[in-house]
Amino acid sequence: MKLLFPIFASLMLQYQVNTEFIGLRRCLMGLGRCRDHCNVDEKEIQKCKMKKCCVGPKVVKLIKNYLQYGTPNVLNEDVQEMLKPAKNSSAVIQRKHILSVLPQIKSTSFFANTNFVIIPNATPMNSATISTMTPGQITYTATSTKSNTKESRDSATASSPPAPPPPNILPTPSLELEEAEEQ
Protein backbone atom coordinates (compact mmCIF):
# COMPACT_ATOMS: atom_id res chain seq x y z
CA MET A 1 0.00 0.00 0.00
CA LYS A 2 2.86 2.38 0.79
CA LEU A 3 4.27 1.88 -2.68
CA LEU A 4 0.97 2.38 -4.48
CA PHE A 5 -0.22 5.39 -2.52
CA PRO A 6 2.25 7.95 -4.01
CA ILE A 7 1.13 6.97 -7.51
CA PHE A 8 -2.48 7.12 -6.41
CA ALA A 9 -1.98 10.52 -4.74
CA SER A 10 -0.20 11.96 -7.77
CA LEU A 11 -3.12 10.93 -9.97
CA MET A 12 -5.54 12.45 -7.50
CA LEU A 13 -3.66 15.74 -7.38
CA GLN A 14 -3.45 16.16 -11.15
CA TYR A 15 -5.36 19.03 -12.73
CA GLN A 16 -8.19 16.82 -13.89
CA VAL A 17 -8.80 13.08 -13.98
CA ASN A 18 -11.68 12.58 -16.37
CA THR A 19 -13.62 9.33 -16.08
CA GLU A 20 -16.89 10.61 -17.49
CA PHE A 21 -16.25 9.08 -20.92
CA ILE A 22 -17.12 5.69 -19.40
CA GLY A 23 -20.31 7.14 -17.94
CA LEU A 24 -19.31 6.75 -14.30
CA ARG A 25 -19.70 10.41 -13.40
CA ARG A 26 -16.86 10.17 -10.92
CA CYS A 27 -13.60 12.04 -10.50
CA LEU A 28 -10.38 11.67 -8.52
CA MET A 29 -10.01 7.98 -9.33
CA GLY A 30 -13.55 7.28 -8.19
CA LEU A 31 -13.26 8.98 -4.79
CA GLY A 32 -15.13 12.11 -5.85
CA ARG A 33 -18.47 12.57 -7.58
CA CYS A 34 -19.43 14.93 -10.36
CA ARG A 35 -22.39 17.05 -9.26
CA ASP A 36 -24.00 20.36 -10.00
CA HIS A 37 -23.59 21.51 -6.38
CA CYS A 38 -21.49 20.06 -3.55
CA ASN A 39 -23.10 19.17 -0.22
CA VAL A 40 -22.30 21.20 2.90
CA ASP A 41 -19.67 18.77 4.22
CA GLU A 42 -18.07 18.17 0.80
CA LYS A 43 -15.35 20.21 -0.91
CA GLU A 44 -15.01 21.09 -4.56
CA ILE A 45 -11.65 19.86 -5.85
CA GLN A 46 -11.82 20.27 -9.61
CA LYS A 47 -14.26 20.50 -12.52
CA CYS A 48 -15.94 17.58 -14.30
CA LYS A 49 -16.75 19.11 -17.68
CA MET A 50 -19.69 21.36 -16.72
CA LYS A 51 -20.06 20.09 -13.12
CA LYS A 52 -18.07 20.19 -9.89
CA CYS A 53 -15.97 17.32 -8.52
CA CYS A 54 -17.11 16.98 -4.90
CA VAL A 55 -15.08 15.06 -2.33
CA GLY A 56 -16.31 14.00 1.11
CA PRO A 57 -14.58 14.77 4.42
CA LYS A 58 -13.07 11.28 4.73
CA VAL A 59 -11.19 11.63 1.44
CA VAL A 60 -9.96 15.09 2.42
CA LYS A 61 -8.73 13.68 5.73
CA LEU A 62 -7.02 10.79 3.91
CA ILE A 63 -5.16 13.18 1.61
CA LYS A 64 -4.13 15.46 4.50
CA ASN A 65 -2.88 12.52 6.58
CA TYR A 66 -0.84 11.23 3.68
CA LEU A 67 0.68 14.63 3.00
CA GLN A 68 1.36 15.16 6.69
CA TYR A 69 2.84 11.79 7.68
CA GLY A 70 3.62 9.98 4.43
CA THR A 71 5.83 12.51 2.69
CA PRO A 72 7.51 14.76 5.29
CA ASN A 73 10.95 14.50 3.69
CA VAL A 74 9.69 15.37 0.19
CA LEU A 75 7.78 18.53 1.05
CA ASN A 76 9.43 21.88 1.69
CA GLU A 77 9.27 23.58 5.10
CA ASP A 78 6.37 25.91 4.22
CA VAL A 79 4.05 23.04 3.33
CA GLN A 80 5.13 21.03 6.39
CA GLU A 81 4.38 24.00 8.65
CA MET A 82 0.94 24.40 7.07
CA LEU A 83 0.10 20.70 7.58
CA LYS A 84 1.28 20.45 11.22
CA PRO A 85 -1.53 19.43 13.60
CA ALA A 86 -2.70 21.63 16.43
CA LYS A 87 -0.94 21.22 19.79
CA ASN A 88 -3.98 19.63 21.45
CA SER A 89 -4.70 17.31 18.54
CA SER A 90 -5.96 13.85 19.52
CA ALA A 91 -3.43 12.15 17.21
CA VAL A 92 -0.52 13.82 19.02
CA ILE A 93 -1.98 12.92 22.41
CA GLN A 94 -2.54 9.31 21.32
CA ARG A 95 1.02 9.04 19.98
CA LYS A 96 2.47 10.36 23.27
CA HIS A 97 0.28 7.94 25.25
CA ILE A 98 1.36 4.97 23.13
CA LEU A 99 5.04 5.91 23.47
CA SER A 100 4.68 6.20 27.26
CA VAL A 101 3.00 2.77 27.49
CA LEU A 102 5.60 0.92 25.36
CA PRO A 103 8.20 0.49 28.17
CA GLN A 104 5.50 -1.01 30.39
CA ILE A 105 4.56 -3.53 27.71
CA LYS A 106 8.18 -4.59 27.24
CA SER A 107 8.70 -5.08 30.99
CA THR A 108 5.84 -7.56 31.46
CA SER A 109 6.82 -10.97 32.77
CA PHE A 110 6.52 -14.30 31.01
CA PHE A 111 3.44 -15.08 33.11
CA ALA A 112 1.47 -12.85 30.73
CA ASN A 113 1.46 -15.83 28.34
CA THR A 114 -0.68 -17.95 30.73
CA ASN A 115 -3.95 -18.88 29.05
CA PHE A 116 -7.05 -20.76 30.15
CA VAL A 117 -7.91 -23.28 27.46
CA ILE A 118 -11.40 -24.79 27.15
CA ILE A 119 -11.84 -27.74 24.82
CA PRO A 120 -15.41 -28.86 24.01
CA ASN A 121 -16.34 -32.27 25.51
CA ALA A 122 -13.23 -32.24 27.68
CA THR A 123 -12.09 -30.88 31.01
CA PRO A 124 -10.65 -27.38 31.11
CA MET A 125 -6.93 -27.19 31.67
CA ASN A 126 -4.64 -24.37 32.66
CA SER A 127 -1.81 -24.05 30.17
CA ALA A 128 1.36 -22.01 30.61
CA THR A 129 3.89 -21.49 27.87
CA ILE A 130 7.38 -20.33 28.80
CA SER A 131 9.83 -19.22 26.13
CA THR A 132 13.45 -18.29 26.69
CA MET A 133 15.24 -15.96 24.30
CA THR A 134 19.01 -15.74 24.38
CA PRO A 135 20.98 -14.28 21.46
CA GLY A 136 22.90 -16.91 19.53
CA GLN A 137 21.01 -19.86 21.01
CA ILE A 138 18.05 -21.95 19.93
CA THR A 139 14.73 -21.14 21.62
CA TYR A 140 13.05 -23.99 23.48
CA THR A 141 9.43 -23.89 24.55
CA ALA A 142 8.07 -25.83 27.52
CA THR A 143 4.34 -26.36 27.97
CA SER A 144 2.78 -27.80 31.10
CA THR A 145 -0.80 -28.64 32.02
CA LYS A 146 -2.49 -29.29 35.35
CA SER A 147 -2.67 -33.03 34.79
CA ASN A 148 1.01 -33.30 33.81
CA THR A 149 2.24 -31.32 36.81
CA LYS A 150 -0.04 -33.17 39.23
CA GLU A 151 1.22 -36.57 38.04
CA SER A 152 4.86 -35.53 38.22
CA ARG A 153 4.43 -34.19 41.77
CA ASP A 154 2.77 -37.39 42.95
CA SER A 155 5.34 -39.77 41.50
CA ALA A 156 8.55 -40.22 43.45
CA THR A 157 10.61 -40.97 40.35
CA ALA A 158 9.52 -38.11 38.14
CA SER A 159 11.65 -38.11 35.05
CA SER A 160 13.22 -34.88 33.87
CA PRO A 161 12.43 -33.62 30.36
CA PRO A 162 14.86 -34.69 27.65
CA ALA A 163 17.94 -32.53 27.28
CA PRO A 164 17.91 -30.17 24.29
CA PRO A 165 20.35 -30.88 21.47
CA PRO A 166 23.63 -28.95 21.47
CA PRO A 167 23.28 -25.59 19.67
CA ASN A 168 26.26 -26.20 17.35
CA ILE A 169 24.71 -29.19 15.56
CA LEU A 170 22.29 -28.21 12.81
CA PRO A 171 19.80 -30.84 11.65
CA THR A 172 20.17 -31.97 8.06
CA PRO A 173 17.24 -32.95 5.84
CA SER A 174 18.33 -36.60 5.84
CA LEU A 175 18.34 -36.72 9.66
CA GLU A 176 14.90 -35.14 9.78
CA LEU A 177 13.57 -37.77 7.35
CA GLU A 178 15.04 -40.59 9.46
CA GLU A 179 13.48 -39.16 12.62
CA ALA A 180 10.09 -38.86 10.89
CA GLU A 181 10.27 -42.50 9.77
CA GLU A 182 11.08 -43.69 13.31
CA GLN A 183 8.01 -41.97 14.71
UniProtKB/Swiss-Prot annotation:
Leader sequence segment: 1-19
Organism: Gorilla gorilla gorilla
GO biological process, alphabetically ordered: defense response to bacterium
Biased composition (Pro residues): 161-170
Keywords: Antibiotic, Antimicrobial, Defensin, Disulfide bond, Secreted, Signal
Region (Disordered): 141-183
Protein purpose: Has antibacterial activity.
Family in the record: Belongs to the beta-defensin family.
GO CC list: extracellular region
Protein's recorded name: Beta-defensin 129
